[in-house]
Amino acid sequence: MCDEDVAALVVDNGSGMCKAGFAGDDAPRAVFPSIVGRPRHQGVMVGMGQKDSYVGDEAQSKRGILTLKYPIEHGIVTNWDDMEKIWHHTFYNELRVAPEEHPVLLTEAPLNPKANREKMTQIMFETFNTPAMYVAIQAVLSLYASGRTTGIVIDSGDGVTHTVPIYEGYALPHAIMRLDLAGRDLTDYLMKILTERGYSFTTTAEREIVRDIKEKLCYVALDFEQEMQTASTSSSLEKSYELPDGQVITIGNERFRCPEAMYQPSFLGMESAGIHETTYNSIMKCDVDIRKDLYANTVLSGGSTMFPGIADRMQKEITALAPPTMKIKIIAPPERKYSVWIGGSILASLSTFQQMWISKQEYDESGPSIVHRKCF
């Protein structure tokens, strides 16, 4: 196990994207969509070698003839057969490694059901025959990646947003808040408000175009009302975007109305609190003695925190909720899109971590429930 040339594999399975690579690297080698596609129609050409399923980018590029499924919904695995296909694709096609030769570090959503952790463990040892594995909570890894062990992580990806207070490396489960509002919802909302402007985006293929518009042009306003005023009186906030067919569309207040839904979920017809309130509520559920450390170490993580302006807005909103003299610091690392993976890479390469792995032998002796004793 202590062999230097046997690098651990780090796999961060998100609702939208899977990030995978080798421990010790500073970025994931493979980043691909967490999708499995199956042909909608029977193949008519004999001997074309049509496959019964496609994964990731290949599924994405053939989406016109496939039915696409996301096996991870709101951060939690709901379809294990498809999940197995994604892992198989990760090891054999993307990383080109034999999983039976490397320890594997997987990530999980906060509050992941116990049965799910056991199932992950079982698949790794029984299907892929890994020599060792470990399951780490995503938000905790993001915090490690920022060089901290105490703080509150606002982790927002494609399928779910969590606010996770962490003290000395341990997530505090009673104070974790989950918000089913993330990147996919913002893309859908942008599709809806662009339709109001007279542009029609409806298919799954067009949704990808809108996702690109969102990633390239959207930003978070510091003062929403004031920004709306500016947008209505001048064209200074308008930007144009060229569609794949050459048509150019103009987008104005949609640029900041879309991510505003994170602060005002009522825009999406949701009754929940915005991410700033969720963060505050999480902090208030923690022991009074550690709140100061959480306010001063508020870390953003995940692709849906990549909007320009989000850190300043977060600072403003939390300052308004917190006690007046409180020092509030929002940390927004530039690589936060991949900070869960980076944290995993750091953790799996620490010498002190090597005794933490669940070995095949321990699994054979105790069964899948070993994961609750060794990973927390």
Curated annotation (Swiss-Prot):
The keyword Lipid metabolism does not apply. The modification Methionine (R)-sulfoxide is found at residues 45, 48. Transmembrane segments: none annotated. InterPro entries: Actin, Actin/actin-like_CS, Actin_CS, ATPase_NBD. Its EC number is 3.6.4.-. Oxidation of Met-45 and Met-48 by MICALs (MICAL1, MICAL2 or MICAL3) to form methionine sulfoxide promotes actin filament depolymerization. MICAL1 and MICAL2 produce the (R)-S-oxide form. The (R)-S-oxide form is reverted by MSRB1 and MSRB2, which promotes actin repolymerization. The keyword Hydrolase applies. Keywords: Acetylation, ATP-binding, Cytoplasm, Cytoskeleton, Hydrolase, Methylation, Nucleotide-binding, Oxidation. It catalyses: ATP + H2O = ADP + phosphate + H(+). It is found in: Cytoplasm, Cytoskeleton. The modification N-acetylaspartate is found at residue 3. It is an enzyme of class 3 (hydrolase). GO terms for molecular function: ATP binding; hydrolase activity. This is Actin, cytoplasmic. It comes from Planorbella trivolvis (Marsh rams-horn).
